Amino acid sequence: MQKLSEVYRGKAKTVYATENPDFLVLEFRNDTSALDGKRIEQFYRKGIINNQFNHFIMLKLEEAGIPTQLERLLSENELLVKKLDMFPLESVIRNRAAGSLEKRLALQEGLLLDPPIYDLFLKNDSLHDPIVTESYCETFGWASTAHLVKMKELSYKVNDVLSPLFDAADLILVDFKLEFGLFKGEVILGDEFSPDGCRIWDKTTLNKLDKDRFRQNLGGLIEAYEEVAKRIGVPLN
């Protein structure tokens, strides 16, 4: 399918229109950002790794009956996807305490959360993506009650599918964010699933193998992404 004009340029991906109004092309770039996009650096091969990683994960979720925007892989850094009407929200599943939750509640990093916590955040860089409740979403029209229920249900189902996958590779899926949208009235998983949007630790050493390596200036970002991909079976070119 032919890639046409640029529709949107995000922090790490560019979205293009196609001749079919129901489909878009996602191009994964080498950009890596932190601090709500204020800090941006480029890492060689990152776009390729994240595209292949995301494609692999979305296939796993589709196989488990979770609807995603995935259509097919187009190139090493491009993906054909359904065009969704996105909710302005991030759904976050937390299996361990880390990041903003750890700071907000003064928790010990790595504390096991049983059952896992589900959070909602409003996608707004200028407001630093504030945490919101379902009541806020309904009042301000960001999502209906039925759609919120479905997003939460699918988020936990994603966790049920992916946590064992990472566990079998001696990795801990600490937390992750998801974004959903509507395609012909159905709630569908959109955006991406890659080490950019989740926390992954080595089960034995608790070494961080995700974007926190960039946020915390730990170094070795691409090596960490490749390590995770290799362990879970992502076929990297």
From Swiss-Prot:
GO cellular component annotations of the record: cytosol
This protein's UniProt keywords: ATP-binding, Ligase, Nucleotide-binding, Purine biosynthesis
Pathway: Purine metabolism; IMP biosynthesis via de novo pathway; 5-amino-1-(5-phospho-D-ribosyl)imidazole-4-carboxamide from 5-amino-1-(5-phospho-D-ribosyl)imidazole-4-carboxylate: step 1/2
A biological process term (GO) from this entry: 'de novo' IMP biosynthetic process
Pfam families: SAICAR_synt (PF01259)
EC number: 6.3.2.6
SUPFAM superfamilies in the cross-refs: SAICAR synthase-like
InterPro entries: SAICAR_synt/ADE2_N, SAICAR_synt_PurC, SAICAR_synth, SAICAR_synthetase, SAICAR_synthetase_CS
Enzyme class, first EC level, given as a word: ligase
Catalytic activity entry: 5-amino-1-(5-phospho-D-ribosyl)imidazole-4-carboxylate + L-aspartate + ATP = (2S)-2-[5-amino-1-(5-phospho-beta-D-ribosyl)imidazole-4-carboxamido]succinate + ADP + phosphate + 2 H(+)
Molecular function (Gene Ontology), one example: ATP binding
PANTHER family named among the record's database cross-references: MULTIFUNCTIONAL PROTEIN ADE2, SI:DKEY-6E2.2
Family note: Belongs to the SAICAR synthetase family.
Name used for this protein in its record: Phosphoribosylaminoimidazole-succinocarboxamide synthase
